[in-house]
């Protein structure tokens, strides 16, 4: 999905990058750089670094990659390398130079890193805390791509928490790493306006794409040391946190207003997703059961409603919500099934009535 579909860029760098002496000088030796990243979005940054390092006048080379150890993924539960490790291997990068410590403070790993004598480390969603012993190794420090406008949304889930809050503006920051979480001086940033329908996986991918461009643009100043001088300290009085998402946060409560639920669906898309319970009433048999499913895609309804009845209007399931608002649900997913449209789900109900689930009442539990 093209970034122009979701974003209107209206502010670029923290300070415009001017041609530095390093860009015109001739490097007798490429400076070793170590990249740290793990999920699929990190491969965008690694790809940008690979491409830049292959240029004839490149000032650096990717000397090693640090990533999470292999883990069991997908339905087969086979041990698989991280997406970053797999991407590097597919590009022909030496497996001996792909380091996978359980923790970044392991003595053996730190000894290996020291032997590489990196000038700079770059992190992009690595997933491990970097101890002081690590941060002291690279001569020029460690620089992180963080998908928020620091000091806003420091922590593990900046994109998700920003969408959950319904922000109209977000961005990506390039900052030096210090011991305190996401608190280092900011080298540069870019701001974007956020579309009201974009979901976390798409926003995350787009921010890391823009972050990779920002990194390549700023690398000359980082490598010649001028970035450290221009980097701006963060305003601690404006700092906010973006804590890791817990699985039990996935449940939706329709007592909340529709816009709150819509933002949560967008924020938790991918993982952990958003779940709901409804009462299925079969008038023929007189049975009332509880049905659980995931809500995949929504929009805020334009009509007010007070009823507890869930109905189907045009292309959406209409859920009554708090404050006389309504949430239009466009896609759902039943347990073990594929994502389906609201229309297909409604047809599958075969005339049964759907009502909001009330925790104060007791019904037998089913998952259809």
Question: In which residue ranges do the predicted regions lie?
Answer:
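A short, local hydrophobic-aromatic micro-motif
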Residues: 61-63, 184, 291, 296, ...
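Residues in well-ordered beta-strands of folded domains
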Residues: 175, 253, 277, 294-296, ...
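Residue-level detector of beta-strand structural context in well-folded domains
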Residues: 250-252, 274-276, 308, 315-317
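Short acidic, glycine-rich loop/turn motifs
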Residues: 176-178, 277-290, 320-323
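Charge-rich, low-complexity intrinsically disordered and helical linker regions
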Residues: 85-89, 282, 313
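One-carbon transfer enzymes
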Residues: 2-272, 325, 334-336, 344-368
